[in-house]
A protein has these predicted regions:
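Extracellular/periplasmic envelope-modification machinery, especially enzymes
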Residues: 1-171
Length: 171
Protein backbone atom coordinates (compact mmCIF):
# COMPACT_ATOMS: atom_id res chain seq x y z
CA UNK A 1 0.00 0.00 0.00
CA UNK A 2 1.29 3.42 -0.93
CA UNK A 3 1.88 6.12 1.66
CA UNK A 4 0.05 9.29 0.56
CA UNK A 5 3.37 11.17 0.75
CA UNK A 6 4.54 8.87 -2.08
CA UNK A 7 1.33 9.19 -4.10
CA UNK A 8 1.36 8.20 -7.75
CA UNK A 9 0.73 11.18 -9.99
CA UNK A 10 1.08 12.11 -13.61
CA UNK A 11 0.44 15.03 -15.93
CA UNK A 12 -0.71 18.20 -14.19
CA UNK A 13 -2.38 16.27 -11.31
CA UNK A 14 -5.45 18.49 -11.67
CA UNK A 15 -7.59 15.47 -10.76
CA UNK A 16 -7.29 13.50 -7.52
CA UNK A 17 -8.83 10.22 -6.38
CA UNK A 18 -9.31 9.65 -2.66
CA UNK A 19 -10.66 6.55 -0.97
CA UNK A 20 -10.12 2.87 -0.46
CA UNK A 21 -9.41 0.22 -3.09
CA UNK A 22 -12.87 0.81 -4.59
CA UNK A 23 -11.72 4.32 -5.52
CA UNK A 24 -8.40 2.86 -6.64
CA UNK A 25 -10.16 0.78 -9.29
CA UNK A 26 -10.86 4.04 -11.13
CA UNK A 27 -7.23 5.16 -11.28
CA UNK A 28 -5.96 3.33 -14.37
CA UNK A 29 -8.75 4.38 -16.71
CA UNK A 30 -9.03 7.92 -15.32
CA UNK A 31 -5.29 8.43 -15.67
CA UNK A 32 -5.36 7.23 -19.27
CA UNK A 33 -8.28 9.45 -20.28
CA UNK A 34 -7.01 12.50 -18.41
CA UNK A 35 -3.54 12.26 -19.97
CA UNK A 36 -5.13 12.04 -23.42
CA UNK A 37 -6.96 15.29 -22.63
CA UNK A 38 -3.83 17.08 -21.38
CA UNK A 39 -4.53 16.69 -17.66
CA UNK A 40 -3.30 14.26 -15.02
CA UNK A 41 -4.19 12.33 -11.90
CA UNK A 42 -2.89 12.05 -8.35
CA UNK A 43 -4.02 8.92 -6.52
CA UNK A 44 -4.52 9.19 -2.76
CA UNK A 45 -6.17 5.78 -2.54
CA UNK A 46 -5.28 3.24 0.14
CA UNK A 47 -6.73 -0.21 0.74
CA UNK A 48 -9.57 -0.31 3.33
CA UNK A 49 -9.10 3.39 4.01
CA UNK A 50 -12.05 5.59 3.00
CA UNK A 51 -11.81 9.36 3.42
CA UNK A 52 -13.01 9.67 7.03
CA UNK A 53 -11.11 11.10 9.99
CA UNK A 54 -10.38 9.23 13.22
CA UNK A 55 -11.78 5.86 12.13
CA UNK A 56 -10.30 2.71 10.65
CA UNK A 57 -11.58 -0.45 8.99
CA UNK A 58 -10.67 -4.10 8.55
CA UNK A 59 -7.04 -4.62 9.53
CA UNK A 60 -5.80 -1.12 8.66
CA UNK A 61 -5.59 0.93 11.88
CA UNK A 62 -3.05 3.16 10.13
CA UNK A 63 -5.98 4.58 8.16
CA UNK A 64 -6.22 7.33 10.79
CA UNK A 65 -2.67 8.44 9.94
CA UNK A 66 -3.25 7.96 6.20
CA UNK A 67 -6.11 10.45 6.34
CA UNK A 68 -4.00 12.96 8.28
CA UNK A 69 -1.37 12.70 5.55
CA UNK A 70 -4.03 13.07 2.86
CA UNK A 71 -5.14 16.31 4.52
CA UNK A 72 -1.55 17.57 4.68
CA UNK A 73 -1.24 17.00 0.94
CA UNK A 74 -4.62 18.60 0.19
CA UNK A 75 -3.74 21.67 2.26
CA UNK A 76 -0.53 22.06 0.23
CA UNK A 77 -2.39 22.29 -3.11
CA UNK A 78 -1.76 25.63 -4.79
CA UNK A 79 -4.75 25.45 -7.12
CA UNK A 80 -8.26 24.03 -7.23
CA UNK A 81 -8.50 20.31 -7.95
CA UNK A 82 -11.20 18.00 -9.23
CA UNK A 83 -11.43 15.45 -6.44
CA UNK A 84 -13.16 12.10 -6.96
CA UNK A 85 -14.12 10.28 -3.77
CA UNK A 86 -15.40 6.74 -3.55
CA UNK A 87 -15.31 3.82 -1.14
CA UNK A 88 -16.90 0.58 -0.15
CA UNK A 89 -19.60 2.38 1.82
CA UNK A 90 -20.82 -0.92 3.25
CA UNK A 91 -17.81 -0.87 5.59
CA UNK A 92 -18.92 2.42 7.18
CA UNK A 93 -21.03 0.29 9.51
CA UNK A 94 -17.87 -1.55 10.61
CA UNK A 95 -15.71 1.47 11.45
CA UNK A 96 -13.53 1.38 14.55
CA UNK A 97 -12.29 4.16 16.82
CA UNK A 98 -8.67 5.29 16.44
CA UNK A 99 -6.06 3.35 18.37
CA UNK A 100 -3.33 4.99 20.47
CA UNK A 101 -0.61 3.97 17.99
CA UNK A 102 -2.13 3.52 14.52
CA UNK A 103 1.15 3.04 12.63
CA UNK A 104 2.51 0.41 15.01
CA UNK A 105 -0.89 -1.33 15.15
CA UNK A 106 -0.94 -1.34 11.34
CA UNK A 107 2.50 -2.99 11.22
CA UNK A 108 1.13 -5.60 13.65
CA UNK A 109 -1.89 -6.18 11.39
CA UNK A 110 -4.36 -5.39 14.19
CA UNK A 111 -7.93 -6.26 13.21
CA UNK A 112 -9.91 -5.86 16.45
CA UNK A 113 -10.94 -2.53 17.90
CA UNK A 114 -13.71 -0.52 19.52
CA UNK A 115 -16.67 -0.28 17.15
CA UNK A 116 -17.63 3.23 16.07
CA UNK A 117 -21.14 4.55 15.61
CA UNK A 118 -21.98 4.33 11.90
CA UNK A 119 -23.61 7.78 11.97
CA UNK A 120 -20.35 9.28 13.24
CA UNK A 121 -18.44 7.67 10.36
CA UNK A 122 -20.92 9.11 7.83
CA UNK A 123 -20.73 12.50 9.55
CA UNK A 124 -16.92 12.50 9.22
CA UNK A 125 -17.22 11.59 5.53
CA UNK A 126 -19.74 14.38 4.95
CA UNK A 127 -17.64 16.91 6.88
CA UNK A 128 -14.58 16.05 4.77
CA UNK A 129 -16.55 16.68 1.58
CA UNK A 130 -17.80 20.01 2.93
CA UNK A 131 -14.26 21.01 3.89
CA UNK A 132 -12.92 20.17 0.43
CA UNK A 133 -15.66 22.31 -1.12
CA UNK A 134 -14.94 25.17 1.30
CA UNK A 135 -11.30 25.02 0.15
CA UNK A 136 -12.58 25.59 -3.39
CA UNK A 137 -12.19 22.11 -4.81
CA UNK A 138 -14.68 20.49 -7.18
CA UNK A 139 -15.79 17.31 -5.39
CA UNK A 140 -17.31 14.33 -7.19
CA UNK A 141 -18.63 11.48 -5.04
CA UNK A 142 -19.14 8.16 -6.79
CA UNK A 143 -21.68 6.01 -5.02
CA UNK A 144 -22.02 3.07 -5.05
CA UNK A 145 -19.45 0.97 -6.84
CA UNK A 146 -20.72 -2.61 -7.06
CA UNK A 147 -18.61 -5.34 -5.53
CA UNK A 148 -17.31 -8.10 -7.76
CA UNK A 149 -20.04 -10.43 -6.47
CA UNK A 150 -22.91 -8.09 -7.45
CA UNK A 151 -24.76 -7.88 -10.73
CA UNK A 152 -24.20 -4.18 -11.49
CA UNK A 153 -27.14 -3.89 -13.86
CA UNK A 154 -29.58 -5.31 -11.29
CA UNK A 155 -28.12 -3.18 -8.51
CA UNK A 156 -28.43 0.09 -10.42
CA UNK A 157 -31.90 -0.82 -11.67
CA UNK A 158 -33.02 -1.45 -8.08
CA UNK A 159 -31.60 1.95 -7.04
CA UNK A 160 -33.54 3.68 -9.81
CA UNK A 161 -36.70 1.78 -8.93
CA UNK A 162 -36.33 2.73 -5.27
CA UNK A 163 -35.96 6.41 -6.23
CA UNK A 164 -38.87 6.44 -8.71
CA UNK A 165 -41.41 8.14 -6.41
CA UNK A 166 -39.07 11.12 -6.07
CA UNK A 167 -39.11 11.90 -9.80
CA UNK A 168 -41.80 12.89 -12.29
CA UNK A 169 -40.50 10.29 -14.69
CA UNK A 170 -37.61 7.99 -15.38
CA UNK A 171 -35.80 8.14 -18.67
Amino acid sequence: MRDPYDACSNGDSSWVTIGDSYAGTLDFYLSKVLLEKGHGLMSLTYEQCPFVNDFWFGNVPECVEVNKRRWNIIKSFKERKNIIISANYYFFREGKLATNNPLEDGRNNLSYGIRANEDEVWHSFSKNIETLQALGHNVIVIYPIPSVTEDAKKMYLSLITDLKPQFDGII
